[in-house]
Amino acid sequence: MVGGDFYDNPKPYEQELAEQRAKIIKEGTLPKEQYLINDTARKQIIPHMLETMKQQNITYSVIDGFHIPEQYVRIITLDFQPWEIILASDGYPYLCTTLQESEEKLTWQRENDPLNIGQFKATKAFAKGNNSFDDRAYIRFKV
């Protein structure tokens, strides 16, 4: 987020796989709560996910500790005024201008759609007993 404007860097396959997982769960015969214990829908998409992950930092960029080809780095030009910048991982389904708000939205998501198959779709759910469905990082600073 730069100056309140949201910039996303999604993995090219992730939304499609999240949609596929949501469809498997919605059309499945298992009780929905079962997927919080044993997410068999995720297990079905894992092979495709692993295959596409082989292209990380080859055909698209991710921050994973390895070299990122320059052509996949998004450059956001700023002028010489103060700018507030927020960098966050995809563990926040709804990025807000404060960490507290982002955490509140995460809590709302966990309480209202722990499978992540509604408005926000993900390739994994909030596993039973977990406060999150993914790792989280959030930093806000001004330049």
List PLM regions with ranges.
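Surface-exposed beta-loop interaction hotspot
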Residues: 1-51
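C-terminal catalytic subdomain
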Residues: 38-143
